[in-house]
Amino acid sequence: MDRYSKIVEKQAREIVLLRGTGCACPSCAFCDYHDDKCADETANFQLNKSVLDAVTGEFGELEVINSGSVFELDSQTLAYIRDVCYQRGISVVHFESHYIFRERIPALRSFFEGIDVKMKIGIETFDFEFREQVLNKGIDESAPELICAAFQEGNFLFGISGQTRASMERDIQLGLRYLERICINIMCKNTTSITPDEKVIRCFVEEIMPQYADDQRVDILISNTDFGVGD
């Protein structure tokens, strides 16, 4: 599995895929990333350190993802991320977190004092019924502005039966209204019961994507490995 890469288009940054103890919300119907986990924090740190040692700081910006939330990374890994940022001139670091951990974000910012911490939330869609009844995301808030209040960036998931051009456009517009940047992920076949809908994907690619392909605030991942990490 590739765990280090560089994103050179749009917001240039290095990216690392680290390993935590396991996603606290493994019930999302569309996701099997939570299989990338280990209960042994010492083993996790050893792996994560080897990945972080590849970071150069050349862009001054680092995105850190794991198969869950940043709060599932061990304390040694978090401290090492901070050290790497300080030592290699990284002034901006991006982390991902589930909505349920939003109240822990201020403490994380304090821990990374002097570094601009950007928090990304996996929203998937602002359609409450679709998100909770179909995707089983576990976000009990329906108001977009409240969901986004503690976050600067958001992940959205398109290409599933039941989504329409109107629903996808609404998600993008609301995401750009309440967040600094968004990342659109196209559903890829995996081990879950949620499968890609080629008609919905074609609608996005042909009718929506051209409007945002060059938008510096919008990342678009047709494949889940387009950032160069994962497998």
Regions found by a protein language model. Give the residues of each.
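N-terminal pre-core extensions flanking Radical SAM catalytic domains
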Residues: 4-7, 27-30, 217, 221-231
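Conserved C-terminal portion of the radical SAM core fold
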Residues: 140-197, 204-226
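Acidic (Asp/Glu)-rich catalytic clusters
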Residues: 52-57, 81-88, 106-116, 142-149, ...
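Distinct, well-ordered alpha-helical segments
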Residues: 73-82, 102-112, 165-169
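Short, aromatic/basic amphipathic alpha-helical patches
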Residues: 79-84, 107-111, 197-212
